[in-house]
Amino acid sequence: MDRGAAAAQGTAPPQDGEQPAESPEPPPPWPPPPPPPAPPPAPPLLSEASPEPIPEPCPELAPGPCPEATSESATELYTEPTPEPATEPASEPAPEPATEPAPEPATEPAPEPAPEPATESAPEPTPEPALESVPEPAPELTPEVAPELAPEPTPEPVTELAPEFCPEAAPEFRPSPAPCLLQCPVDTRERGLKTSPSPSPSPSPRTPMSWSRIKKILKEGPMLKNCNSFKRWKLRYFLVQGQKLYFAHHPAFAHFETIDLSQATVAESSCRNLCHSFCVITPQRKITLAAPNRKDMEEWINIIKTIQQGEIYKIPAAENNPFLVGMHCWYSSYSHRTQHCNVCRESIPALSRDAIICEVCKVKSHRLCALRASKDCKWNTLSITDDLLLPADEVNMPHQWVEGNMPVSSQCAVCHESCGSYQRLQDFRCLWCNSTVHDDCRRRFSKECCFRSHRSSVIPPTALSDPKGDGQLVVSSDFWNLDWSSACSCPLLIFINSKSGDHQGIVFLRKFKQYLNPSQVFDLLKGGPEAGLSMFKNFARFRILVCGGDGSVSWVLSLIDAFGLHEKCQLAVIPLGTGNDLARVLGWGAFWNKSKSPLDILNRVEQASVRILDRWSVMIRETPRQTPLLKGQVEMDVPRFEAAAIQHLESAATELNKILKAKYPTEMIIATRFLCSAVEDFVVDIVKAWGQIKQNNTAIVSVILKSDLMYDRLSVLIDVLAEEAAATSAEKSATEYADSSKADRKPFIPQIDHIAKCKLELATKAQSLQKSLKLIIFQVEQALDEESRQTISVKNFSSTFFLEDDPEDINQTSPRRRSRRGTLSSISSLKSEDLDNLNLDHLHFTPESIRFKEKCVMNNYFGIGLDAKISLDFNTRRDEHPGQYNSRLKNKMWYGLLGTKELLQRSYRKLEERVHLECDGETISLPNLQGIVVLNITSYAGGINFWGSNTATTEYEAPAIDDGKLEVVAIFGSVQMAMSRIINLHHHRIAQCHEVMITIDGEEGIPVQVDGEAWIQRPGLIKIRYKNAAQMLTRDRDFENSMKMWEYKHTEIQAAPQPQLDFQDSQESLSDEEYAQMQHLARLAENLISKLNDLSKIHQHVSVLMGSVNASANILNDIFYGQDSGNEMGAASCIPIETLSRNDAVDVTFSLKGLYDDTTAFLDEKLLRSAEDETALQSALDAMNKEFKKLSEIDWMNPIFVPEEKSSDTDSRSLRLKIKFPKLGKKKVEEERKPKSGQSVQSFIGNLWHRRHREDEAEGDDPLTPSRSQL
């Protein structure tokens, strides 16, 4: 009996729409058994599926995966049709009978009525032709045999598993030891089908087809499903096939529920989404699922969103998926106030769970309304419509408007009235510059988007292109040479580790996509930094922001090395990891405060200054393991080696003579192989006898001379092979070219025959043997004493290459002589470091294995011993249980526990016996210690200044990250590391040097860590030397304070009320003299505006003055030239007005006085970092100041320059209030803070502990707003 009938014992089909009953035994692992049988097909549907009566249908697999199907890529799921469906299975023995009596014969003609299944679980009936693929009848078929069971879709076991679905006569069987991976749902239209009563002896001529050839399984796997029951979350098995989602209790079930995904949308469950859950929304139902991890969840979402475009057989990655262009990225959210749906325009109540929001464009929608949402998310280069594409010589960017749902304090950029409404969806907001305007004012607003304050960091979507059409965006070449200052002077590339910071990186991803171009924000867990660096590498300069820990920073810097972009980019760090030592040193703080907006990061990065960070290569040369001699090989003494070496030399000479006298290519090839074999045997004998050779100087000299002779024979061989190859190729090329020219005049392409290929391979092998002999000679010389080395130096390569040559042939350039000269030059070009690193004990290794290799690059610190052991244990535990290490506080607690454990174990209490230290070539005598730390920065292990202080002493210089020096520190135990967090220790300093060499002795490895990444280092040498320097962005707090001070002054200037004239005075016209003065002031203002516009293209911080510049330019154009200006410098092309009223003069003067005050405050705070530009700007301001003094002499103009002061009574009352209450409060606070007698020791210890952490907390906080007294 076939295995398809055996599945009926483990699983039975559900009745009347109930859930399928689980197997009485827990499902064992793979390979799974086939699904349970189902009723035979009914005659009516059979006639629809096939025009001819089919006597015996092959059971068809449900539209799910086969037992061998996995959740791998969908491209691996194609299968070939099975030409022999009745092939006998070989891998499924049936030694034990396990039959089940069938209640009815398989040939019963009466159809059995089908039960009432769920309509959504019905798959598409396309694979009906599979019913014609059975060549022989099966009278033992029971009524439960399902016609939906089709042959396996995987290609390898097709011939083996096909009989499972084509029943044969078998009296007994044994069930398969594992359930099927997945079976497809049972179609309700096919559930009543039964087999034909009259079997046909002849097979059908049609080729059998499987479900997997029609619809591929795009993804499958287990997920948790929210069942709205007591347990809520239950494990189910899911798969996506075609445009449908199938799920069941277990992959072995034959009956699956079905969800149609042709009209569906997906929304994540929350903003941070720690549970990796998402909701699939269709017009009929909503289902909430939870994936094992975020990567798996994003793959499901990517597939579900992609197949809405149709049945797609290859799903691209989400980052480069052209099918997702313009689609919204929804997640569930709620608001404390009423919102409005951007699709149906209806209101969304406050705290409603039915609201979802797009993480990029912040569009709101009901869940069901999202099905009808248009694909108008924030633009990238692929989603811009044709009418928005601009010519290549323009960098202008249009606005992208979103209607309604304004922030509370929104104001119209045109009329400065409030925008938005709680009652309806009205007014518009630009996604790029965040400007809000009324619908009526939008036509009067500028058509060009200026990106507001962050325009220097944003890449316009018009500047990107997709030349290959694969979603890999690059900066268009048409925009490289344009003036990017108005839109993108120094763009910002953002890399975020979404797992860092207790999944705070997810919030950063969404926020930065809202503030910037979504195409310039990358998740490091999705392909790493390669895609972002490839897109930005054509910019002359750009900035990089890494949101993560020290490991993420090292990852990005290593890719910058590979791309060679250190001269172009500057890197800033936002601390989201555990230690964040580099971020502390660069001034970005110990951690990021979750209560702060990520928008502050953009301001700080744009105001940061550049500092150089030294980077160091960690070079490793491991001591190769002593490999025992092969079976049959024994160690050789010196006499035996001498005899064997002479035989090898004679054999090599004999074979070389055969090569020189060979008449046929085959003879040359055979002799060359024997010559190479003789050289290999010679090298192996040296390895065997080296233990005896290195104790005898005479034997060492003999090895050098014999190796020299072998090297000379190989040089002759290589020259002969080169001459033969050149002559043969020239002759053959000429012959073939002549033949081809006579034939059809096609272009000639030379071909390499078998003999030429063999000669080429032998020449390559001979060159490799030459390198080995070269290494042997130089290493053997190192074993000689000084006297013998001086004696043999003349007899080495110098005697071989020059002294033995005939003086008459010195000027000749024979091939042999050329080869020798080339070899000598290559030997002389070897570095002394390579010669010192060779070891003849390990010649059976390749030369590369006994040289230094760069293991990694150090940015922060290097540790060996105790601290590396703690870091290694922590990393091992985190890899095993990632859920327990998802927060910064937990990680610090684990570090403390592991350090306490080492306090008791003292694993490396005698490390100085196994480790030797050299600093700048000088051997350092080590005390009794447990670890060594090499510092590049002044922060170690989460904020410890392990060097002790940042000041210089008589013995050591002050440490710095750009001084080209390393600080070496000793670790005596866990207590010392703990005390270093409280007080500065100095007694454990070892050295300050430019290069460090550490030797590890013994046979066991020692833990080593670089920047928190630890591993077990085998015995050998570790060298730390300078590699290169990186440009890092450090937080400039002085500049930030100056900018805040300017912003405070700017706010006061803008808040100053404009003086008002009497109605009669306001209507009077200016005199000729007054009008001339106003015209002169306007010209000076135009000069200042022009200078500020030019400086804004060079200095990005000047952009804060553009608001005052635009306002002054507009009022000059409106009043002096009578035009509605959107252009700052449009006055030159207009006809000036002949006279002005006093009211207009007051408006112009007040606006220009505001621009003057803003610019003066900008220079007073030293915000312009260029002395030459500051001098030019100051001269323009001085000219305007002189004109203001002349205008202040006019009586009706004086209130503008001398504002009214407040009355003395108000000031005195205000002063008394300011002085009286703070004194009482201060006295009370001092009394409360006065320590009691029993708390003095506790207070001292607490203050001592918290003193180390106050600086980090202060770094994360913004400085206080400057008071009026400071101004």
From Swiss-Prot:
<keyword id="KW-0479">Metal-binding</keyword>
<keyword id="KW-0547">Nucleotide-binding</keyword>
<dbReference type="InterPro" id="IPR001206">
    <property type="entry name" value="Diacylglycerol_kinase_cat_dom"/>
</dbReference>
<feature type="region of interest" description="Disordered">
    <location>
        <begin position="1252"/>
        <end position="1271"/>
    </location>
</feature>
<feature type="repeat" description="3">
    <location>
        <begin position="56"/>
        <end position="59"/>
    </location>
</feature>
<feature type="repeat" description="6">
    <location>
        <begin position="68"/>
        <end position="71"/>
    </location>
</feature>
<feature type="repeat" description="31">
    <location>
        <begin position="168"/>
        <end position="171"/>
    </location>
</feature>
<feature type="repeat" description="25">
    <location>
        <begin position="144"/>
        <end position="147"/>
    </location>
</feature>
<dbReference type="GO" id="GO:0008270">
    <property type="term" value="F:zinc ion binding"/>
</dbReference>
<feature type="zinc finger region" description="Phorbol-ester/DAG-type 2">
    <location>
        <begin position="398"/>
        <end position="449"/>
    </location>
</feature>
<feature type="modified residue" description="Phosphotyrosine">
    <location>
        <position position="78"/>
    </location>
</feature>
<feature type="region of interest" description="Disordered">
    <location>
        <begin position="805"/>
        <end position="825"/>
    </location>
</feature>
<feature type="repeat" description="8">
    <location>
        <begin position="76"/>
        <end position="79"/>
    </location>
</feature>
<dbReference type="Pfam" id="PF00130">
    <property type="entry name" value="C1_1"/>
</dbReference>
<feature type="repeat" description="32">
    <location>
        <begin position="172"/>
        <end position="175"/>
    </location>
</feature>
<feature type="repeat" description="14">
    <location>
        <begin position="100"/>
        <end position="103"/>
    </location>
</feature>
<comment type="pathway">
    <text>Lipid metabolism; glycerolipid metabolism.</text>
</comment>
<dbReference type="InterPro" id="IPR046349">
    <property type="entry name" value="C1-like_sf"/>
</dbReference>
<feature type="repeat" description="19">
    <location>
        <begin position="120"/>
        <end position="123"/>
    </location>
</feature>
<feature type="repeat" description="7">
    <location>
        <begin position="72"/>
        <end position="75"/>
    </location>
</feature>
<dbReference type="Pfam" id="PF22944">
    <property type="entry name" value="DGKD_4H"/>
</dbReference>
<feature type="compositionally biased region" description="Low complexity">
    <location>
        <begin position="1"/>
        <end position="15"/>
    </location>
</feature>
<feature type="repeat" description="33">
    <location>
        <begin position="176"/>
        <end position="179"/>
    </location>
</feature>
<keyword id="KW-0067">ATP-binding</keyword>
<feature type="repeat" description="2">
    <location>
        <begin position="52"/>
        <end position="55"/>
    </location>
</feature>
<feature type="compositionally biased region" description="Pro residues">
    <location>
        <begin position="82"/>
        <end position="116"/>
    </location>
</feature>
<feature type="repeat" description="15">
    <location>
        <begin position="104"/>
        <end position="107"/>
    </location>
</feature>
<protein>
    <recommendedName>
        <fullName>Diacylglycerol kinase kappa</fullName>
        <ecNumber>2.7.1.107</ecNumber>
    </recommendedName>
</protein>
<keyword id="KW-0597">Phosphoprotein</keyword>
<feature type="repeat" description="10">
    <location>
        <begin position="84"/>
        <end position="87"/>
    </location>
</feature>
<feature type="repeat" description="26">
    <location>
        <begin position="148"/>
        <end position="151"/>
    </location>
</feature>
<feature type="compositionally biased region" description="Pro residues">
    <location>
        <begin position="52"/>
        <end position="66"/>
    </location>
</feature>
<dbReference type="GO" id="GO:0030168">
    <property type="term" value="P:platelet activation"/>
</dbReference>
<comment type="subunit">
    <text>Does not form homooligomers.</text>
</comment>
<feature type="repeat" description="12">
    <location>
        <begin position="92"/>
        <end position="95"/>
    </location>
</feature>
<dbReference type="InterPro" id="IPR016064">
    <property type="entry name" value="NAD/diacylglycerol_kinase_sf"/>
</dbReference>
<dbReference type="InterPro" id="IPR017438">
    <property type="entry name" value="ATP-NAD_kinase_N"/>
</dbReference>
<comment type="similarity">
    <text>Belongs to the eukaryotic diacylglycerol kinase family.</text>
</comment>
<feature type="region of interest" description="33 X 4 AA approximate tandem repeats of E-P-A-P">
    <location>
        <begin position="48"/>
        <end position="179"/>
    </location>
</feature>
<dbReference type="GO" id="GO:0005524">
    <property type="term" value="F:ATP binding"/>
</dbReference>
<dbReference type="GO" id="GO:0035556">
    <property type="term" value="P:intracellular signal transduction"/>
</dbReference>
<feature type="repeat" description="18">
    <location>
        <begin position="116"/>
        <end position="119"/>
    </location>
</feature>
